[in-house]
């Protein structure tokens, strides 16, 4: 059976006067899969359960030995699915409208929350609408942007139209950053709102810096370690971070670059760059230790909806270079708590990386301010935001009220007709 560690409760299970919701969550990726969507959703779900809500989660089966992991307030339904090409550790769910409809009829959730936009997510939208259950959706991944990195750029428009059609059939689309809200409005999305992300600042903490780990990397306490954490994949624009590091080496030949993560480009990049340190996938305390043991964090991706690693690097006390959008634009100030080159400006990214790599005092100063900002990004705020949206759109607060109003209006019409008939 899969382990499913519970984070520390963020609040009492039930707060007097606060509504408790039954939520059907539909996702094509979930713990223990390692990606930003699975990681943040797992935390959100656990926090909602700890706050007393009833969560019914639908997801594809993750291998033959996978099994449900129910507990009080949380149940799973495993669905049929298939591996995603080039991402063998991830799956998409098959269409399953009839199965979902049967479960929705039986459970009658207050709201259906669709997290991913694959065939399973689309089936959930259709099933919920057929039954008159309010459905909300998340925009968490820029799939249409990925097409440019896999030589199928022609498909970008098709994917973009598919995503817009799906989301516009839901009551509201939730996304983690304000600049993405504005971008989606420009694309024709109807109703979009920010629900941001939180970070565990006790787990990701500068105190996790480990000199023995740095020794394994072949560096002393003063040598510069440039860090990348994330998927080793084309859409992460990872080769720009390597290019920036090579520029650093021209003035600082003792610098080291450490890359944490797995992905389809890992073997290729490792063979091309034998002097770089590829650590593979790290989780929990090990991941926190790797973050805190670095000095300068590079994140050149241009396909993020948020970028959870930015918050993790901030909390870990690292100097940070990232393009000015998504999480970096939401929480960091250029020259104050990070260096933020303009979106897609490759030379700016390299120049700022070199500048900050040569200024240890400034690096520590901006890292401290980034850490302070990360302290405000609590998961409790995220849970409260979701509760507010569930209150606004759920069947218990919204749909039934509309039905009641329609009934009242109908009775008024009947009464008016009766009065007219009596008058004649």
Task: State the predicted function of each range.
Residues 2-78, 380, 411-424:
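N-terminal subdomain of nucleotide-sugar transferases
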Residues 59, 77-80, 156, 160-210, ...:
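Donor nucleotide-sugar binding/catalytic pocket of nucleotide-sugar-dependent glycosyltransferases
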Residues 104, 281-282, 289-294, 386:
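Short alpha-helical donor nucleotide-sugar binding micro-motif in glycosyltransferases
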Residues 220-236, 242-246:
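Conserved donor-binding/catalytic core segment of Leloir-type glycosyltransferases
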Residues 266-288:
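Nucleotide-activated donor-binding/catalytic signature segment of Leloir-type glycosyltransferases, i.e.
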Residues 302:
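Aromatic "clamp/platform" in nucleotide-sugar-dependent glycosyltransferases that forms part
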Residues 319-322, 332, 339:
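Short hydrophobic beta-strand element within catalytic cores of glycosyltransferases
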Residues 334-335, 339-346, 355-360:
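Conserved acidic donor-binding segment of nucleotide-sugar-dependent glycosyltransferases
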């Amino acid at each position: 059976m899969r382990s499913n560690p519970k984070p520390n409760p963020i609040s009492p299970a039930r707060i007097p006067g606060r509504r408790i919701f039954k939520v059907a969550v539909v996702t094509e990726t979930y713990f223990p899969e390692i990606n930003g969507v699975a990681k943040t959703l797992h935390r959100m779900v656990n926090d909602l359960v700890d706050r007393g809500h009833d969560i019914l989660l639908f997801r594809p089966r993750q291998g033959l030995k996978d099994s449900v992991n129910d507990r009080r307030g949380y149940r799973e339904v495993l669905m049929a699915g298939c591996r995603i090409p080039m991402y063998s550790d991830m799956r998409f769910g098959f269409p399953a409208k009839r199965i979902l409809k049967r479960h929705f009829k039986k459970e009658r959730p207050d709201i259906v929350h669709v997290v991913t936009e694959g065939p399973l997510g689309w089936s959930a939208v259709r099933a919920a609408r057929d039954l008159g259950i309010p459905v909300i959706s998340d925009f968490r991944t820029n799939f249409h942007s990925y097409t440019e990195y896999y030589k199928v750029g022609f498909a970008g428009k098709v994917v973009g139209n598919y995503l817009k059609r799906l989301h516009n059939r839901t009551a509201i689309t939730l996304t983690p950053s304000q600049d993405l809200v504005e971008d989606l409005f420009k694309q024709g999305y109807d109703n979009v709102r920010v629900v941001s992300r939180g970070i565990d600042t006790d787990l990701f903490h500068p105190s996790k810096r480990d000199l023995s780990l740095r020794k394994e990397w072949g560096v002393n306490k003063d040598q510069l370690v440039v860090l990348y954490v994330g998927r080793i994949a084309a859409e992460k624009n990872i080769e720009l971070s390597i290019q920036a590091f090579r520029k650093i080496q021209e003035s600082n030949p003792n610098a080291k670059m450490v890359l944490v993560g797995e992905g389809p480009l890992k073997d290729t990049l490792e063979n091309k760059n034998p002097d770089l340190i590829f650590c593979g996938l790290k989780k929990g305390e090990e991941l926190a230790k790797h973050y805190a043991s670095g000095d300068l964090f590079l994140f050149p991706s241009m396909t993020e909806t948020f970028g959870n690693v930015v918050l993790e690097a901030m909390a870990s006390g690292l100097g940070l270079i990232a393009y000015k959008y998504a999480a970096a634009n939401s929480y960091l100030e250029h020259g104050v708590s990070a260096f933020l080159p303009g979106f897609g400006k490759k030379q700016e990214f390299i120049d700022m990386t070199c500048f900050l790599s040569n200024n240890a005092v400034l690096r520590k100063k901006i890292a401290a301010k980034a850490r302070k900002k990360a302290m405000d990004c609590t998961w409790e705020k995220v849970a409260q935001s979701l509760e507010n949206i569930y209150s606004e759109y759920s069947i218990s607060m919204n749909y039934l009220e509309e039905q009641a109003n329609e009934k009242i209006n109908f009775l008024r019409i009947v009464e008016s007709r009766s009065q007219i008939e009596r008058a004649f």
